[in-house]
Structure formats: structure tokens, C-alpha cells
């Protein structure tokens, strides 16, 4: 089973950016299989919508390092771990810029990028970037079309509702062909259908506590059905599970969630956000926790 960890990107860690390189290097030395970033712009004073699955807007989202910059640092200081995003909010970005950033990081890392994308959920963040939230689904779909075009063969050309690219040359392509694997987060029927029709895999999320396999298996049943309807092989779709933690969670509890996901939901790749809700208070603390999680999981 592959085990990874989020880079120290949010909250107090954002004020110590040197920790990104330090954690990435040491996580690789311990044998971590993947390193991950998220994508947040701001923490509203009076949020209209709270973080999915919670009743609050996490305070650590008040400070967040740029995900592309953090992944670039990790790409440069490591040689083996996969480098993923969970998730980049695709509708915020002009596809040529998103395609270029991910292709560049894939080049710098020697082909280790996992492009984890989502539709977004914060109305305040959508307003901040000037994108109508009501268009997020259609923009997301067009973004996926455009990424495939920009990462494909030259000449590149795209004509859509939101973006248009006249025929031209884009010679910086991802090392991975036809592009980095695209994994999507999804919480709605439409989102799950999108995963089945368009993606290489699904990015569910859980928190430590009693693990319920249907958190993974329920959506995957709908996703695989959508894949079959689209003429795709449903068994080719992967699952990478995100485990969000919070202060007070035990290392044994975290490892138990990962192991139950492996044994009861056939999850073969999971990553743990040790800095979510301030479980790890420093890079040294995060390294210690990561090492203990790795030891517990690999012992079983």
C-alpha cells in the first residue's frame, strides 16, 4: 500500500515556508510514497458555506502557501515520491496556465505529478477570483477538455464556451503521456458522474474515527457505473484516500483508518494531512508523526 502526506502548507506552517523542503526531504528518507498540497485562497470572516463534512471553516485556511510553488519545491528536493494536489480548484484557472504549471512540475519532477482537481465549494473564493460559482461545473468540464488539448500533440487548439485558443505550438509537455493522471474529488451525483466519464480516479476524504467503508465504496459504485455507461473500463479507475486529522488524534487511530480502508474498501493509496486542524505543530512534529504512521501501517 502506498502512504503519503500533505506538505506543511497551511496555518502556522505557512509562516515557515522553509519547512516545505525540510519535510519533503525527510518524508522521502522515511519512505513516504507521495506528497500533497491543497488550494485555498482565504478564510471568510462570515462564511456562507463551511468546509465540506464539518460545521466550521478551518482557521488554518487563513494562511496558505501557493500549491504550485510548494509542489515545485518538493519536486526539486526529492526524486521518488509522487507529487499530488488534493485538490486544485480547476474552475478558478485559465486552462493554458493550469496546463503549463502542471506540465512544468511534471518536467521538474521527472514525471511524478498526480493532478488532483475539484470544482470548489466556497462562494467567497469564487467571488474573489471573479468566477461565477454557478458556472463551476461547466467550467470544470471545459477545463478538462482544454487540459487534454494543451498536453496533447501540436498544434494545440481549443474552442469552448469560456476559453478559446487558436491553433499554435505548446512544446512544454508533461513527461507522463498523454498527461499526468487526473484524479477528481466529488461529493454530488454530477461530480461522481464526471469522475466516471472523465478521470483516472477518485479522491475521497475521511477523518480519524470509526471507518465506514461505504464512504469509499458507495461513491465508487456510482463512479464505476458512470464509467461503464461511457464505454470505459470501470476497473481501471483508481482511488486515493485523503485522511484529514485534527488536534488530539492518535497515531494509532490514524493508522487504523488507513488499514481499514485498505482491508475493507480495497484502497491501495492513502495520504494523511498531519497539519490539518493543527495536529502537527512544527515540521519536526510532522516528521515524527509521519514516521510513526508509516511504521504502524507497514507493520501490518
Q: Where are the model-predicted features located?
A:
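Active-site-adjacent structural elements that line small-molecule/cofactor binding pockets in enzymes
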Residues: 1-300
Amino acid at each position: 500500500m502506498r502512504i503519503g502526506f500533505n506538505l506543511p502548507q497551511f496555518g502556522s506552517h505557512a509562516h515557515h515556508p522553509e519547512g516545505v523542503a525540510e519535510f519533503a526531504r525527510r518524508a522521502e528518507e522515511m519512505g513516504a510514497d507521495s506528497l500533497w498540497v491543497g488550494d485555498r485562497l482565504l478564510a471568510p470572516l462570515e462564511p456562507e458555506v463551511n468546509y465540506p463534512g464539518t460545521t466550521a471553516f478551518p482557521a488554518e485556511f487563513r494562511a496558505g502557501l501557493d500549491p504550485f510553488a510548494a509542489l515545485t519545491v518538493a519536486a526539486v528536493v526529492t526524486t521518488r515520491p509522487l507529487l499530488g494536489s488534493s485538490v486544485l480548484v480547476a474552475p478558478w484557472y485559465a486552462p493554458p496556465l493550469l496546463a503549463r504549471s502542471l506540465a512544468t512540475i511534471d518536467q521538474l519532477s521527472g514525471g511524478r505529478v498526480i493532478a488532483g482537481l475539484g470544482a470548489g465549494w466556497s462562494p467567497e473564493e469564487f467571488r474573489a477570483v471573479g468566477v461565477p460559482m454557478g458556472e463551476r461545473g461547466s467550467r470544470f468540464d471545459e477545463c478538462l477538455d482544454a487540459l487534454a488539448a494543451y498536453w496533447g500533440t501540436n498544434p494545440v487548439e481549443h474552442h469552448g464556451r469560456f476559453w478559446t485558443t487558436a491553433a499554435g505550438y505548446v512544446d512544454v509537455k508533461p513527461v507522463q503521456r498523454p498527461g499526468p493522471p487526473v484524479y477528481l474529488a466529488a461529493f454530488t451525483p454530477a461530480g461522481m458522474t464526471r469522475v466516471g466519464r472523465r478521470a483516472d480516479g477518485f479522491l475521497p476524504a475521511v477523518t480519524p474515527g470509526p471507518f465506514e467503508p461505504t464512504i469509499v465504496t458507495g461513491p465508487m459504485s456510482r463512479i464505476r457505473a458512470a464509467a461503464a455507461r461511457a464505454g470505459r473500463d470501470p476497473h481501471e479507475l483508481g482511488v486515493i484516500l485523503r485522511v484529514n486529522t485534527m488536534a488530539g488524534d492518535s497515531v494509532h487511530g490514524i493508522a487504523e483508518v488507513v488499514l481499514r480502508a485498505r482491508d475493507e474498501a480495497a484502497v491501495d493509496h492513502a495520504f494523511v494531512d498531519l497539519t490539518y486542524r493543527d495536529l502537527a505543530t512544527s515540521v519536526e512534529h510532522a516528521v515524527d508523526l509521519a514516521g510513526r504512521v508509516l511504521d504502524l501501517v507497514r507493520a501490518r
